[in-house]
Amino acid sequence: MEERMQKTLTNVIDLPQRDRTESKWYEGVQTFMWMTEDNIVEVTFDKEHLLEAILDPKNLNRAYKTVMRNKGCGGIDKMSCEQLLPWLLANKDSLIRSLQDGTYRPNPVRRVEIPKDNGKKRLLGIPTVVDRLVQQAINQVLTPIYERQFSRTSFGFRPKKGCHDALREAQKIVNEGYRYVVDLDLERFFDTVCHSRLIEILSRTIKDGRVVSLIHKYLRSGVINHGVFETSKEGTPQGGPLSPLLSNIMLNELDKELERRGLLYVRYADDAMIFCKSKRAAGRVRDSITEYIENKLHLKVNREKTKASNVNGVKYLGYTFSSINDYKLSVHPKSKAKMKSKLKELTSRSNGWGYEVRKRKLTEYVRGWIGYYYLASLKTFLSKMDEWLRHRIRMCIWKAWKRPKTRMENLIKCGIDAYEAHRVSYSKWRGYWRITGTPILHMAISNANLKKKGYPCLLDSYLEWHPK
């Protein structure tokens, strides 16, 4: 079925193919890397005729598959991903024609607010599915061009790079003797990107004015917030396929300035650390680079949060640095507290979840958390957390048994003597925490039994990443 849909799509978005030996826009070609689903390969096209590359049927087909794979909710028109193919069957000619002649008008994005840990909200802008398709097609052509320009120590939203690469690079720099850091904080970066400055930067590389104009239309498409249209005079709304690339293109200017000054740094999206060998040098760098960012890039630096300090205890991507002989990556205390708070939420006795739902949610969260924080040494911490988590799980099970008679029967099934089972089940002890901490409950709902029933163990999950 899926293969038949892909063949249909290829026919839907098929454009007349030009003979490359006779094509005018193929003259003066240049070779760039091209992203596929599995790798980056080199292809050849002309930067002055990028729109043709964007509208190439193979590129559009790949963009369609990416949009379908990523799913996501609909935009202001409420069109779902499943409705995209029927829409293309009916409207593909007018869509492609409007993109070619410059009459295409992107829809405003739908405002979505996501709560942040600090109590504030992250503003997302969800494009329509059709706009996501077009943005993804643009992204696939521009990414390999800009990948050649981007810095080696820029890790956010890039192929085959990620948070762990950024953390390892930061650890390496610190262990080379750069023990002081400027922890750069850009205030509401995605919401405050200067459109004119970004367009100027784009125009240096993209010589096809039609593509620059199309990107500018997306930047200025506006927002629907609670049913009210708002103009977008600045910012690259998070939520669309183009936003990560545009943010990297903007902050690549900062990367090049840092490299020009000979400074070592690591950047993941708008989260950057600049490394120095003394606190005095870090202070000078903080002041001068703040001036550059605000005056040249027209971005706002949060001066209260942008600090020059020793690297010990600085939070970066959820981790921090600690040293005995050399510097190791550790989980920041705030990240640990957030994890404990989430586990407490997942083991709440009042959420009404059954055993299977709770086990599934716990397992998903534990695997995700360990999969991200496994770079740190966590055996001692996770052993203590396992004790606490199992105690919380026992409370959930004890409450689920409800009636004293049921509790007594289940304790006996677990191998507890009938007298002890009766004593505990009908006791007037107050508090789930107290009663589930007794030796009887530990014997009945043992660690081995919990593991056998499928409840996750933090330490076991960690040891899967660190078998030694």
Per-range role (PLM):
Residues 1-89:
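Non-catalytic, polymerase-adjacent accessory regions of viral genome-replication enzymes
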Residues 392, 401-468:
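Extended C-terminal regions of large enzymes
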Residues 73, 83-108:
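Amphipathic alpha-helical blocks
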Residues 123-124, 128:
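Conserved phosphate-binding loops in nucleotide/dinucleotide-binding enzymes
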Residues 3, 346-407:
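Right-hand nucleic-acid polymerase module
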Residues 138:
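Nucleotide/phosphate-binding loop and acidic/charged catalytic motifs
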Residues 220, 296-367:
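A conserved non-catalytic segment of reverse transcriptases
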Residues 98-113, 117, 152-313:
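Conserved polymerase palm-domain catalytic core
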